[in-house]
């Protein structure tokens, strides 16, 4: 067995403004922590998952096929590991189904921790493709607007057509986020299945304009323009 390597990944907000599936930001102070160490055997195993209270989590499984941390870590280990075993401990700091990127935080923290076991770790940007695999299990879709900011921090534009390449955006001075969390849970995969499959041409034009305006406002450090673009269509 090796020493434990610990990694923290912050919570995140996806679908920022009109940036559905393509624009996300990281939140400071709240997140998941994953510990990883080398063990005898092969592949990834999950020793325990603990909740916000520090106790064994009542809902999250240690089954490696049902946990975003182990799914992401296994995808990484399959390509960069040495064939040995890795044990994970997951400590949840993000509430489940809260809209704060809980599954993404676990996936990112796991990949970063396992990456730390390598003699020559990969760069952070190279880890995104593996974290996405964990998020894909939870949400049923290929998008990075939670995993990318959780991995890289800050505000990130994640066009699906360019993945795993993403674009980090500057945040204008004076902008902060106030988070209001209703006492309810929404399953991401179920919520996505309820979405309309199409929109009108005018909605699409309006959406493109607001998203482009938001990106331009960030680049110009124009907080007032950012505010004008943060509305739905």
Briefly describe each language-model feature range.
Residues 43-49, 100, 168, 188-193:
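Short, charged, solvent-exposed linker or helix-capping segments at domain edges/interfaces
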Residues 104-121:
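Active-site-proximal alpha-helical scaffold in enzymes
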């Amino acid at each position: 067995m090796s020493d434990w390597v610990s990694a923290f990944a912050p919570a995140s907000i996806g679908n920022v403004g009109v940036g559905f599936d393509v624009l996300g930001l990281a939140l400071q102070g709240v997140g998941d922590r994953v510990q990883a160490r080398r063990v005898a055997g092969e592949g990834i195993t999950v020793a325990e998952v603990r909740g916000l209270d520090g106790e064994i989590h009542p809902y999250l499984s240690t089954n490696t096929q049902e946990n975003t941390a182990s799914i992401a870590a296994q995808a990484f280990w399959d390509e960069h590991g040495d064939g040995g075993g890795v044990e994970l401990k997951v400590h949840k700091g993000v509430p489940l189904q809260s809209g704060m990127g809980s599954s993404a935080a676990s996936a990112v923290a796991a990949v970063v921790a396992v990456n730390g076991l390598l003699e020559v770790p990969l760069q952070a940007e190279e880890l995104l493709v593996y974290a996405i695999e964990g998020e894909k299990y939870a949400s049923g879709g290929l998008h990075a607007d939670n995993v990318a900011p959780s991995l890289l921090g800050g505000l990130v534009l994640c066009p699906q057509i360019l993945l795993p390449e993403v674009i980090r955006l500057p945040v204008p001075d004076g902008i902060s986020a106030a988070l209001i969390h209703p006492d309810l849970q929404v399953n991401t995969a179920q919520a996505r299945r309820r979405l309309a499959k199409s929109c009108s041409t005018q909605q699409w034009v309006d959406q493109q304009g607001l998203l482009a305006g938001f990106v331009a406002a960030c680049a110009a450090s124009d907080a007032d323009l950012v505010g004008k673009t943060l509305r739905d269509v």
